[in-house]
Amino acid sequence: MQKQNSKMYPVVHFEMPAEDRVRVADFYTRVFGWETNQLGADMGNYLLVMTTESDKKGPKKPGAINGGFYQKTPDAPSCPSVVIKVDNLAQHIEKVKKAGGKILGEPMDIPNVGLFVSFADTEGNRVGLMQPYGQ
């Protein structure tokens, strides 16, 4: 087992692409009972998904995560990805680069949530980093 950091950072969110967010919302609501919240154009028409009972801090059940769907486009990743919670986004951007990853775009502010950026790991997987507000 490989372990370098004294602190482990948890997966707190998942993302999947969707061609039709209305259709995908209906599918996951009908099959799994998930609740959805369609955000506006200012948030990229992102579709938030609650997979378990949640409040403003997130899922109430320990270990559970919520997620979302983004518009599937030719230049966006076409596979699911995860978001990892960190306590210092700038520091982790540097760690990603130093370890051989590539930052995808610029960090963005998600109102009332936190700072977010995506990266590609050494295998080409798209992963998100989130520094929640209040950290």
Report the location of each language-model feature.
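Vicinal oxygen chelate
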Residues: Q2-K7, M16, N37-G40, I93-Q135
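Mid-chain, well-packed structural core segment of small domains
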Residues: P74-A99
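N-terminal beta-strand motif that seeds the catalytic metal site of vicinal oxygen chelate
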Residues: M1-D26, C79-V82, V86, P132-Q135
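Short hydrophobic/aromatic beta-strand element in the GNAT-like acyltransferase core
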Residues: Y46, N66, F116-S118
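Core segments of cupin and vicinal oxygen chelate
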Residues: M8, E15-G63, K98
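A structural feature recognizing the 12-helix transmembrane core of secondary solute carriers
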Residues: V24-A25, T29, P77, I93, ...
